[in-house]
Swiss-Prot record:
One of its GO terms (molecular function) is oxidoreductase activity. Its EC number is 1.-.-.-. Keywords: Oxidoreductase. This is Baeyer-Villiger oxidase ptaJ. Baeyer-Villiger oxidase; part of the gene cluster that mediates the biosynthesis of pestheic acid, a diphenyl ether which is a biosynthetic precursor of the unique chloropupukeananes. The biosynthesis initiates from condensation of acetate and malonate units catalyzed by the non-reducing PKS ptaA. As the ptaA protein is TE/CLC domain-deficient, hydrolysis and Claisen cyclization of the polyketide could be catalyzed by ptaB containing a beta-lactamase domain. It is an enzyme of class 1 (oxidoreductase). Belongs to the questin oxidase family. InterPro entries: Questin_oxidase-like (IPR025337).
């Protein structure tokens, strides 16, 4: 049997990522391809069943886009490799069975089936091409595709991010990993939320609302704001927001609607608001600290640009991607207990270690900073946000775009300054609306 072409990692000069500033040193593509191939062949997409997403591909590809060379790419690998675990065993009989939609559905959410799904999607790509496979299993509107499309947004957007990297860098192997991650991810119950919000949006005759307005409504709707509780831990969305205020959050989120002729603006608004929640959710008297989950709203926002750039995705599906992303950002804001938002925390930020830097200096520093990939991802997403948001930051409707001008760089500097040289768990605050979590953040 011929080797799977979708199993091979081969980066090319034609697809080196968004938000680039300078070129990579010689040998960078070969080094990155080698590391990504080793990860693909040896490691599970989950290093832990709950919340244990393998970030090695994210980190390596982010550093590549930031202009890193072989040494910096190796640093990205080294910072993520210790926690990884091997792939589960392969069962060729199961791989064959996955061609049956009923057999496929029966194994959704089964992490031990990751390798089987990975091989299944690679086989499908070898036969049909990766665009056709993504279209069939995420965008075809079949019952199975509806579930997988929702699953892309599970786990704080990780399958969406993973597939997005694969599409951005034209790597079918990474796309197959992301689809297999989506298929095996545990569920937070967001499929029902998405479909109900979409149903209500379709029935609505009135105008929609901006995400800024809807964030305010989340914060002032007591049932939604208090739905997630600290003891919920990793199930703040499933048992908290969806479990205790599912009807209310669906009705609220349904009001974010994107007309097809305003697709670019809608995506830019979502990208801007993800950055707004990341930077503006601070606590008076405390040092700046970015919320871990709002950070994921931001890192995933870059892939709105990636998906919108794909000519093979229909306008209708692009609208759906933007709407679902914006609606889920509202859920995650509620899951963090809807902290007060004040953009002055970003506008007035005084950089520390990064004082006087521009984007180039920041990129260079991030390439060598010890991190699991989150820092590189958020900073690159912010640079992309600066570019796509700029046309909408003034003029009519500009109030829907609170992050403007040099605030993008300031927020990127804040991301660097507040995480540098800290253990991974201390780099971020894990729920900015929960007062007890600020106790470990230094006072000013």
């Amino acid at each position: 049997m011929a080797a799977s072409t979708a199993a091979q990692v081969q980066l090319s000069e034609e697809a080196l990522g968004l938000a680039r500033i300078f070129e990579n040193p010689k040998g960078s593509l070969e080094a990155a391809s080698k590391l990504l191939q080793k990860n693909h062949d040896e490691f599970h997409v989950f290093w832990r069943d709950v919340g244990g997403h393998n970030h090695i591909p994210h980190s390596v590809l982010s550093i590549l886009a930031l202009g890193g060379g072989p040494a910096e790419l190796q640093r990205a690998w080294d910072d993520g490799v210790a926690i990884q675990r091997p792939t589960p065993p392969l069962d060729e009989d199961v791989v064959k069975k996955l061609e049956n939609p009923a057999e496929f559905r029966a194994r959704i959410g089964s992490i031990p089936n990751y390798t089987n799904f990975l091989h299944f999607f690679r086989n499908q790509m070898d036969k049909k091409g990766w665009q056709a496979v993504v279209s069939e299993y995420a965008f075809s509107r079949t019952p199975l595709a509806e579930t997988i499309f929702a699953q892309l947004f599970e786990g704080a957007y990780h399958p969406f991010i993973h597939i997005g990297f694969g599409i951005e860098f034209n790597l079918p192997s990474i796309i197959a990993e992301g689809l297999a991650q989506a298929a095996t991810h545990d569920s937070a119950g967001i499929e029902g939320f998405f479909l109900e919000a979409e149903r209500q949006a379709a029935q609505s005759k009135g105008p929609g609302k901006s995400l800024v307005q809807l964030l305010d409504e989340v914060r002032t709707t007591e049932k939604i704001k208090t739905a997630a509780r600290l003891p919920d831990g990793p199930v703040r969305v499933r048992d908290g927001v969806i479990g205790r205020a599912g009807a209310e959050i669906a009705a609220l989120a349904s009001q974010f609607r994107v007309p097809a002729d305003q697709l670019s603006r809608g995506a830019a608004e979502s990208i801007n608001i993800s950055a707004y929640t990341a930077g503006a959710a601070q606590r008076a008297g405390k040092a700046r600290k970015i919320d871990f989950f709002h950070m994921h709203n931001t890192t995933s926002s870059l892939f709105l640009t990636v998906f919108l750039n794909q000519p093979w995705i229909s306008t209708e599906d692009k609208v759906r991607i933007v709407e679902w992303k914006g609606r889920l950002d509202l859920v995650w804001y509620a899951a963090c207990s809807a902290p007060d938002l004040n953009v002055d925390h970003v506008i007035g930020y005084k950089p520390a270690q990064s004082a006087g830097w521009g984007w180039k200096e920041l990129y260079e520093a991030i390439n060598v900073a010890h991190d699991d990939g989150h820092l590189a991802k958020i900073v690159r997403a912010l640079k992309n946000g600066e570019e796509v948001s700029r046309p909408f930051e003034s003029g009519e409707g500009a109030e829907a775009f609170p992050i403007k001008g040099d605030s993008w760089l300031k927020l990127a500097q804040m991301s660097y300054d507040t995480t540098l040289d800290l253990p991974d768990d201390d780099k971020w605050i894990w729920g900015a609306g929960f007062l007890p979590l600020w106790n470990k953040v230094p006072s000013l």
